[in-house]
Amino acid sequence: MSDSKDRKGKAPEGQSSEKKDGAVNITPQMAESLLENNPALRNETAGMDKDKAAEAMRKMNIAELLTGLSVSGKNQKDMASYKFWQTQPVPRFDETSTDTGGPIKIIDPEKVSKEPDALLEGFEWATLDLTNETELQELWDLLTYHYVEDDNAMFRFRYSQSFLHWALMSPGWKKEWHVGVRATKSRKLVASICGVPTEINVRNQKLKVVEINFLCIHKKLRSKRLTPVLIKEITRRCYLNGIYQAIYTAGVVLPTPVSSCRYYHRPLDWLKLYEVGFSPLPAGSTKARQITKNHLPSTTSTPGLRPMEPKDIDTVHDLLQRYLSRFALNQAFTREEVDHWLVHKPETVKEQVVWAYVVEDPETHKITDFFSFYNLESTVIQNPKHDNVRAAYLYYYATETAFTNNMKALKERLLMLMNDALILAKKAHFDVFNALTLHDNPLFLEQLKFGAGDGQLHFYLYNYRTAPVPGGVNEKNLPDEKRMGGVGIVML
């Protein structure tokens, strides 16, 4: 199953060779493909004619060419060039990391600038007030129409206002970490980058970090090289608040991933996914056969399964923390974060964002398991029959079975729980159920008929060095039970 209709950016085999001086032989086809799928590189060569651009690329090394490359061509974002990342406290591609982690750069708060860098004439910095419905709507508009780089994309994320509230106003959120750029004359919001505070564990080292998200630039300003300026500005604001590390994800290659996971997709409404171009019809199969293959039971099978309630927060918090401690990179949840991220509050939330369920033992009434998923719709662009795809994303889950040290029992339990999650998502009118190869997901993805996507999600740490952790896939990029235990954090 493909994350995009065509596999843009897949490198032609046997056409790349690196010279001894680090430069690369670039064929015209490779140059065109690299520019098409690499917004950062495209902006670096903006204004050059084709020959000059090709010549500039020939002088680059592999690291420079790859920085900012999206192998799937989907949801491309300009994440800045290799030259910029060379100036940042991030691990280099060519360095050898050890398990013993630590900050790359010690920040002296006295030396952090109290003022932001100047923007291009005609633009100014803004701090977004997401408690203000007008400003929330402005951010929604920017993300809705400009979060996808490829003008030919078939799908565009549609973040609801409820989703933005949920994602950006978590416990401890700071208004100054919701950064915008406005056009001075029109006051129009033309760029954003946002962060929320949390704590993570990196190989048992607890770090206060900012989760960075929603880096978005208006399409008409993509050549203005705003990305590095946005990253530097939110970094400055975090430093001023005493936070010197960050975690972020990207579908593009940057220096240097701490882990990489693969997307998997389980059709819930196969026919609709086929009609919008998301799911292909396999050779030799029929529509009827695919619908039958992806059919799900109408009722769940786990005894004691019910929606999570506020009374479950303490028990779920304890279970989740113990479960996540099994992973090298994980989120250190507080009770307040469990409440915020997992409990739907219908009295205050216009549109449901998260669904969470617990398993209460019918005899002991103890909570033995829980799972959750969240809603992220996509707008379908120029399709005569459908205008949206409702996607459920597997979020956090945990089970007491994980502590039995019985892998067979854990696999059986997760197969039951996740099959029920699929059934419940189908009942909630979702069209597809998405998951990554993190947590213990490799134990059930293939058996529950998840199809492999062509997209990767790379995890990055800013100003922190540690050896890479496994992302649940082997050297063939397939789910592998032996490659679990690395990523225990889900980024929106």
Swiss-Prot record:
Region described as Disordered: spans on this chain: 1-45
Basic and acidic residues composition-biased segments: 1-22
Chief place of localization: cytoplasm
GO MF annotation list: glycylpeptide N-tetradecanoyltransferase activity
Disulfide bond sites: none
Function: Adds a myristoyl group to the N-terminal glycine residue of certain cellular proteins.
Known partners and oligomeric status: Monomer.
Similarity remark: Belongs to the NMT family.
Name this polypeptide is given: Glycylpeptide N-tetradecanoyltransferase
Organism: Aspergillus fumigatus (strain ATCC MYA-4609 / CBS 101355 / FGSC A1100 / Af293) (Neosartorya fumigata)
Primary gene name: nmt1
